[in-house]
Amino acid sequence: MSERRRSAVALSSRAHAFSVEALIGSNKKRKLRDWEEKGLDLSMEALSPAGPLGDTEDAAAHGLEPHPDSEQSTGSDSEVLTERTSCSFSTHTDLASGAAGPVPAAMSSMEEIQVELQCADLWKRFHDIGTEMIITKAGRRMFPAMRVKITGLDPHQQYYIAMDIVPVDNKRYRYVYHSSKWMVAGNADSPVPPRVYIHPDSLASGDTWMRQVVSFDKLKLTNNELDDQGHIILHSMHKYQPRVHVIRKDFSSDLSPTKPVPVGDGVKTFNFPETVFTTVTAYQNQQITRLKIDRNPFAKGFRDSGRNRTGLEAIMETYAFWRPPVRTLTFEDFTTMQKQQGGSTGTSPTTSSTGTPSPSASSHLLSPSCSPPTFHLAPNTFNVGCRESQLCNLNLSDYPPCARSNMAALQSYPGLSDSGYNRLQSGTTSATQPSETFMPQRTPSLISGIPTPPSLPGNSKMEAYGGQLGSFPTSQFQYVMQAGNAASSSSSPHMFGGSHMQQSSYNAFSLHNPYNLYGYNFPTSPRLAASPEKLSASQSTLLCSSPSNGAFGERQYLPSGMEHSMHMISPSPNNQQATNTCDGRQYGAVPGSSSQMSVHMV
């Protein structure tokens, strides 16, 4: 009964309070309505993420301003206000506690981050074939390299950008060549130590990252599990997936190159299916090799190497000349021709005061700016076929004026006159006129010959060049092409042998490539010392018999008064005649009816 009375009293007092307020009017009722509206405003501010807790507390304190007035009212009124305010503020406290930290704002900012793969078309082409990446012990860079564009970062927040590479599966693969496919070969090898490549520009603001393309072109792959250079360690013949990580600064405490990437709300990871690759130590698919050479700017050496090699093979096939494995004459070997031409008192522009010809005085005749036209040998010259007949038959008139003037400067050379060529051309019978003329490729200034007796008869073929060909000292090391006829007589009276009146072989001697006639200046070799019997046998003649069996022999000629020897390589018989002055050193038989060898003097 007492409880009922208390509740009734309470009800009656509360009802009385409300009835009194209703009867009195509207003053306190208006204040209560205003307080409820303010409490609703506080709840709306608590729902806003930008609303700080301090402002809401001020507003709540501001909303408690009606309480002094309510305290002046009866106890029932204060009880009602306490009940209502406790409900309102409990709701506000819950909302404020949920929005107290920056986590919801950060979460929303991380969700907005997007990463776009650059060079996606190139990655797609490699992926369609089956991307392969070379790994080495020292480390090898990736191609294509991972390049990404990042958007959606907070411009004022600090971020790390990192990359790691994880296995796609737990399988090991092998390449099947006949089907050009990768097949599973077994289970994967044991896991390797984790490695994370942190971009060198980290730590940077979001604005900095968004203004640039983030490139991982310096990242290297290695198969050395003991690597200490920070390279990514991978197993060969496994498939891997690169991943890009965006890590906010406040979540980067556990970030390390030798630890896995931390996981949390401040880390977002991106991967692209087209970047999956298989690690190899050597490319398995030739299509991948060609595509990388074509698209990789660092593979320029491979492209140029192949092209140069092809060009060199084409040149060698076109000219098909043997080149001696020694250094050719350079322009520096002939230095003072122009100076001595104006100031010398000798019989020729290149003759010193003692009358000795100076081969080093023809420097100005070797100017590379003045070059005769390119040509090939005539079909019957040196028994070498002319591949392009329209380039043959070049005479003196075909040379540019600068070449002809240089040739004219050599007219005072006394050495290889027209009589000397007749000695090489024919011995006993009248020689037929050679059909073609061979001139050096650069300039005729380096035409030199072998000393011959001045009493030999003349030859009309070389009259156009006879006065222009000079003789250098016999210490000059010279190469001369010789064409011998297998059907010719072995008793030819000159040192080259063969029936040259039929082959028309000796027209001129060139010392410049690519035409196989060279000049050198070397000291006398001690190996070629003259024996007494050779000295006595070679005092009177320069003649060596040349049989027709096509074998090559090295021959010595030791003229009187000379401290040098001459070697010539020409056809030699199996049994040397006792009368010739050449020692035959066989170099082997040469097929065919012609030989292309050289005479050189040291």
UniProtKB/Swiss-Prot annotation:
Q: Which Pfam families match?
A: T-box
Protein name per Swiss-Prot or TrEMBL: T-box transcription factor TBX15
Q: Which residues bind DNA?
A: 122-304
PANTHER family noted in UniProt: T-BOX PROTEIN-RELATED (PTHR11267), T-BOX TRANSCRIPTION FACTOR TBX15 (PTHR11267:SF98)
Matches recorded under PROSITE patterns: TBOX_1, TBOX_2, TBOX_3
Role noted for this protein: Probable transcriptional regulator involved in the development of the skeleton of the limb, vertebral column and head. Acts by controlling the number of mesenchymal precursor cells and chondrocytes.
Location in the cell reads: Nucleus
Q: Does the keyword Acyltransferase apply?
A: no
